[in-house]
């Protein structure tokens, strides 16, 4: 079988969540199916940079255009909720989230372009892979996709590679500095945490960042808040290892990869009870209403003062994270390809 994949977001060292997913899929599929052929397709703005990436022996490189895709591929897989406007034998698209369509978390222009691409991909895909049950339901309800065409494949998480260090009184948040991540309420809650704790924010600037940064600058606890910007994976693993608590009160997530990463590192997690986060966290996190600042404050204050509960959440988090593997995600994705190649009905 020959599989073509939109590999655009797998290029470079500064990978987003979609980039991590893309790289895990590309590497895993090529490694576990050596007798099959793969076309790693890159859009023009990343094509030249892709030559810095070493491809597996059974993979070739292809310049992907809006109207150009490998014609000989049995299946084309769009790894980030869009497809090229080219003739495709069979198409699979992964949908990560639809928050752009369901909340005020982006500019009108970005929302318009996203909606156009997402609806086009949904209408032309033979199968849709949703990264969570929550996202699957949104694809069905918001985009009107027949449930029979949707398959759920959860992300995996790699064991942490950080240096073993002593945990410090750090509350860590990983994610872009944007409205959707609910950082303003996290800062409000942190104001009431004991003064020997720090809040560390790891993530690049996103929609609404200027207002959030201004709020941090005006906070009483501003001297105890660190903003790191984008943090490379190796360095981020060390922050996960150092943090005594991980806080993730996001308002909307299609999956919530940082929750799993924190759990895999042994950090106890306080997280939102909204969207896909409870599906990922299970009973291994302290879940709170992200719009209730008092509830978030209570959880933070209580957990900073309760080492026994931190230890219990750490243990449960490690067990939970072990259930999510990239090997399983790769195999389930391959089964979707086989469904189409074998001509199995919806």
Language model regions located:
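Carbohydrate transferase catalytic cores enriched for Leloir-type hexosyltransferases
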Residues: 1-346
């Amino acid at each position: 079988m020959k599989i073509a994949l939109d590999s655009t977001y797998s290029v470079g060292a500064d990978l987003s969540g979609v980039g991590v997913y893309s790289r895990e899929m590309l590497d895993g599929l090529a490694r576990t199916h050596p007798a099959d052929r793969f076309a790693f397709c890159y859009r023009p703005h990343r094509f030249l940079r892709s030559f810095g990436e070493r491809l597996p022996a059974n993979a070739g490189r292809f310049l992907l255009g809006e109207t150009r895709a490998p014609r000989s591929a049995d299946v084309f897989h769009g790894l980030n909720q869009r497809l090229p406007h080219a003739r495709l034998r069979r198409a699979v698209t992964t949908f990560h989230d639809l928050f752009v369509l369901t909340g005020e978390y982006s500019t009108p222009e970005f929302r318009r372009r996203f909606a156009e691409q997402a609806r086009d991909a949904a209408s032309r895909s033979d199968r849709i892979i949703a990264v969570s049950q929550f996202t699957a339901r949104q694809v069905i309800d918001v985009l009107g996709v027949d449930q029979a065409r949707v398959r759920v494949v959860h992300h995996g998480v790699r064991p942490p590679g950080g240096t073993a260090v002593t945990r410090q009184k750090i509350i860590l948040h990983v994610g872009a500095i944007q409205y959707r991540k609910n950082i303003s309420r996290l800062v409000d809650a942190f104001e009431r945490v004991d003064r020997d704790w720090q809040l560390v924010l790891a993530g690049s600037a996103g929609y609404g960042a200027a207002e959030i940064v201004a709020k941090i600058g005006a906070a009483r606890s501003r001297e105890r808040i660190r903003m790191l910007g984008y943090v490379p994976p190796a360095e981020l693993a060390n922050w996960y290892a150092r943090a005594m608590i991980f806080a993730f009160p996001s308002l909307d997530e299609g999956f919530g990869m940082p929750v799993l990463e924190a759990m895999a590192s042994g950090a106890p997690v306080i997280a939102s009870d909204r969207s896909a986060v409870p599906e990922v966290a299970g009973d291994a996190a302290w879940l709170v209403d992200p719009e209730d600042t008092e509830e978030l404050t209570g959880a933070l204050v209580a957990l900073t003062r309760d080492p026994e509960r931190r230890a219990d959440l750490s243990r449960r988090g490690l067990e939970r994270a072990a259930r999510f593997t990239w090997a399983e995600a790769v195999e389930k994705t391959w089964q979707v390809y086989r469904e189409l190649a074998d001509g199995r009905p919806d």
